[in-house]
């Protein structure tokens, strides 16, 4: 992935300017409800004007809930850092300003004032959707690479890809592994996936992965039964088939749970969740771990 270099990739990226006597005298937390690249560029530009002190820039992407927000602000308070943010969701922005004020922190809204000015001049209303900006340079090619990766290593086509993935999704058949991987690819994460089948031994490539690279997907047995029945109808196959019986589904789900427990990976229940919702939870897990250096 890009942006792996930096003084503090524990928060997705970092820039450290020369410091006096090797001591960092300032930390800027860049908080965003999307990737946060826009805010980071502005923070870098501002930091570059201060040659006399060390400024450590820590980007925290995909902050989309209040618990995550409070966690980051508390960390910033421990460092007495500056907060620069591009949050377009009003509730999150309001809460951030309240938390920062309560802790005596400087919090700078990099996007809001300009959006307010555009509204005053044009009379238009902002869409208030995170991540609308689209980049067509290096990020575009990284996205294309991630999409190619997801296609090449879909459903265990080539087990060698597991060790090169940013994330590996595991679960029984019809738990949305493939569409979630494609969604993650559009966020420039190289995601592979592997179906868990009781009769198929787990590959060594999976067993050798660190748990933080693996995400387990599970689903309600009743819903999975309906999905598989519909799948058989779509394919024009007669039922019932072993693949779609309740007994088989219960067996597969129990096996998958044992595997996930063995691997020690986080598990997400995809029951009645849209692909975007599942992917959003995965992104939160991924970037929190990056921020914590795990």
From Swiss-Prot:
Keyword Thylakoid attached: no
Keywords tagged on the record: Kinase, Nucleotide-binding, Serine/threonine-protein kinase, Transferase
Molecular-function annotations in GO: ADP binding; ATP binding; phosphotransferase activity, phosphate group as acceptor; protein serine/threonine kinase activity
Keyword Kinase carried by entry: yes
Reactions mediated catalytically: N(tele)-phospho-L-histidyl/L-threonyl-[pyruvate, phosphate dikinase] + ADP = N(tele)-phospho-L-histidyl/O-phospho-L-threonyl-[pyruvate, phosphate dikinase] + AMP + H(+); N(tele)-phospho-L-histidyl/O-phospho-L-threonyl-[pyruvate, phosphate dikinase] + phosphate + H(+) = N(tele)-phospho-L-histidyl/L-threonyl-[pyruvate, phosphate dikinase] + diphosphate
InterPro entries: Kinase-pyrophosphorylase, PPDK_reg
Binding site for ADP: 171-178
Pfam families: Kinase-PPPase
Catalytic activity, EC: 2.7.11.32, 2.7.4.27
Similarity section: Belongs to the pyruvate, phosphate/water dikinase regulatory protein family. PDRP subfamily.
Function: Bifunctional serine/threonine kinase and phosphorylase involved in the regulation of the pyruvate, phosphate dikinase (PPDK) by catalyzing its phosphorylation/dephosphorylation.
Protein name: Putative pyruvate, phosphate dikinase regulatory protein
Organism: Moorella thermoacetica (strain ATCC 39073 / JCM 9320)
Organism lineage: Bacteria, Bacillati, Bacillota, Clostridia, Moorellales
